[in-house]
Regions:
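PLP-dependent amino-acid enzyme catalytic core
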Residues: 1-421
Length: 421
C-alpha cells in the first residue's frame, strides 16, 4: 500500500484498501502488535445457541484493536512527518493506540478528545506521553479542532477510522480470525465510524466470499444504519451511550464505501442490551469489556442469535477500556435488569419489632438485604409508621415476584419498586 491512497485519485473509495494492503499491514505491524487469541466460548455458546469464538483484541497493550491501525499509519510516515509528529481526534482508544506506538517509535503525538471521553482513557493517554487537549461536546467538534491544529503546526492528521492506512491496519484482525477459525460462518463487528468494519469486511470477504459480516451499532449512535438508508454517509443524532467508542455521528466516506457493499446485516443494540452483555462477559468469560467491545455479544443475545443459531460465529471483542466507576454502575444496572437486584419502598410499623418483621419476611423468602434506608420525618401523616427503602439481592424475576407476594401476605404495602418487570 502506498503511504496515502488519497494521493491516487484514480482509485474509487470502494477499492482504496485491498486485501493485499491488509496482508502487507499484517506483516508490517507484526513485531509491535499482540497476536490476540480467538478461543471458543462454551458458556457464550450455551447462552446464545451459536458456536461462539471470541477474538480477544481487548488484550492489546492499550486495551483495544485501535493499536493495529495506529502502528500501521505511524510506520508509513516519511522521515519529516515522523519528526514533526501527528495529531488526531479520538474518544479514547485511537488516541491510546497512537500515544503508545508513538512513544515506542519516538513520534510526537497530539490528540484532541471530546469532553465525554472516559477519564481512564484521558489519564492513560497522558501517561503515555501524548499531548492531550479536551475539546468539544461531540467527536465532530474535536475533529474540527484537530484539523485546525494540523494546519497550524504542520502535523500529519491521522483520522481514527477513515484513513486507508488505519483501515488496512484494523483489517489485520480478520486475517488472524480466519487463520484461527477458517470455517467461521460469521464475524460480528462493533461499528462506530466503520473503520474496523471496513477493514474486516475487505479482508474476510476476499478470502471467504461466503462469510457473513454483521455490523452492530449502538442505537444511540446509528450512523451506519442512517447512511445505508440514504445511500451515502450522512449525519445521525448521537445520544449518550455506554458504547462511547461507537458514539460517532457520521461514518467515514472511505469506510462506508468499503463496508457498505460487503456487509450482510446491520443491527442496533440498546443500552439495556449493552449493560447485560458487559455483565455476561464479566461473569461467563471473566472478561472486563467496555460497552463498544460488548456490542457484538449484545447483538447475539437478541435478534442475531436466533438467525445464527447453530452456526460458527466470531465475536470481535474490540475493547476493554471501561472506567471502573462506570463498570460499577453497569454491573448494578445489569443485575437489576436480570432480576438479581430489587429495590422497593414499603410502609412498616415504627414500633419495636416492625423492622425485624420485614427483614424476617425477606430472609424467609431466601433474599438477602443489601441496604435499608428509613425516613420517620417525611413518611406521611401516620406517626407510628415509617417508609423504608430496601435493596435486596434476588435470584431472578420469579424470585422477585415470590418475595412481593410474601410481603403482601405479611401486610406490608409495597409503594414502589424498581428492578422488576
Amino acid at each position: 500500500m502506498t503511504p496515502n491512497h488519497d494521493d491516487d485519485k484514480s482509485l474509487p473509495l470502494s477499492e482504496s484498501v485491498t486485501a493485499k494492503d491488509i496482508l502487507d499491514a499484517a506483516e508490517r505491524i507484526a513485531d509491535g502488535i499482540y497476536r490476540s487469541p480467538c478461543p471458543p466460548s462454551i458458556p457464550l455458546s450455551e447462552l446464545t445457541g451459536c458456536d461462539i469464538f471470541c477474538k480477544l483484541d481487548l488484550l492489546q497493550r492499550t486495551g483495544s484493536f485501535k493499536e493495529r491501525g495506529a502502528r500501521n499509519a505511524l510506520l508509513l510516515l516519511d522521515k519529516s512527518q515522523k519528526k514533526r509528529g501527528v495529531v488526531a481526534a479520538s474518544a479514547g482508544n485511537h488516541a491510546l493506540g497512537l500515544a503508545y506506538h508513538g512513544k515506542l517509535l519516538k513520534i510526537p503525538v497530539t490528540v484532541v478528545m471530546p469532553r465525554f471521553a472516559p477519564l481512564v482513557k484521558v489519564a492513560t493517554c497522558r501517561r503515555l506521553g501524548a499531548n492531550v487537549l479536551l475539546y468539544g461536546e461531540t467527536f465532530e467538534e474535536a475533529w474540527q479542532r484537530a484539523i485546525e491544529i494540523a494546519s497550524r503546526d504542520g502535523l500529519r492528521l491521522i483520522h481514527g477510522f477513515d484513513d486507508a492506512e488505519i483501515i488496512a491496519g484494523q483489517g489485520t484482525a480478520a486475517v488472524e480470525i480466519l487463520e484461527d477459525v477458517p470455517d467461521a460462518n460469521a464475524i460480528v463487528v462493533p461499528t462506530g465510524g466503520a473503520g474496523l468494519l471496513a477493514g474486516v469486511a475487505v479482508a474476510a470477504k476476499a478470502q471467504r466470499p461466503d462469510i457473513k459480516i454483521i455490523a452492530v451499532e449502538a442505537a444511540a449512535a446509528a450512523s451506519f444504519t442512517a447512511s445505508l438508508a440514504a445511500g451515502k454517509p450522512v449525519n445521525a443524532p448521537v445520544r449518550p451511550t455506554l458504547a462511547d467508542g461507537l458514539a460517532v455521528g457520521r461514518v467515514g466516506d472511505r469506510s462506508f464505501a468499503l463496508a457498505a457493499p460487503r456487509v450482510d446485516r446491520v443491527l442496533t443494540v440498546d443500552e439495556q442490551a449493552l449493560s447485560l452483555a458487559v455483565l455476561r462477559l464479566l461473569e461467563l468469560e471473566k472478561t472486563s469489556c467496555e460497552g463498544a467491545g460488548a456490542a457484538a455479544l449484545a447483538a447475539l443475545m437478541g435478534e442475531a442469535g436466533q438467525e445464527l443459531k447453530g452456526r460458527k460465529v466470531v465475536l470481535l471483542l474490540c475493547g476493554g477500556n471501561i472506567d471502573p466507576t462506570v463498570l460499577h454502575r453497569v454491573i448494578d444496572h445489569g443485575l437489576a435488569l436480570d432480576g438479581r437486584l430489587w429495590r422497593f419502598t414499603a410502609t412498616v410499623s415504627d414500633r419495636p419489632g416492625g423492622m425485624a418483621k420485614l427483614t424476617q419476611v425477606i430472609a424467609d423468602a431466601g433474599a438477602s438485604v443489601l441496604e435499608i434506608n428509613h425516613d420517620r420525618a417525611f413518611s406521611g401523616p401516620e406517626v407510628f409508621s415509617t417508609t423504608v427503602e430496601v435493596t435486596v439481592e434476588t435470584a431472578d424475576q420469579d424470585h422477585i415476584q415470590s418475595l412481593h407476594e410474601r410481603l403482601r401476605e405479611a401486610d406490608f404495602e409495597v409503594i414502589s419498586a424498581t428492578g422488576s418487570r
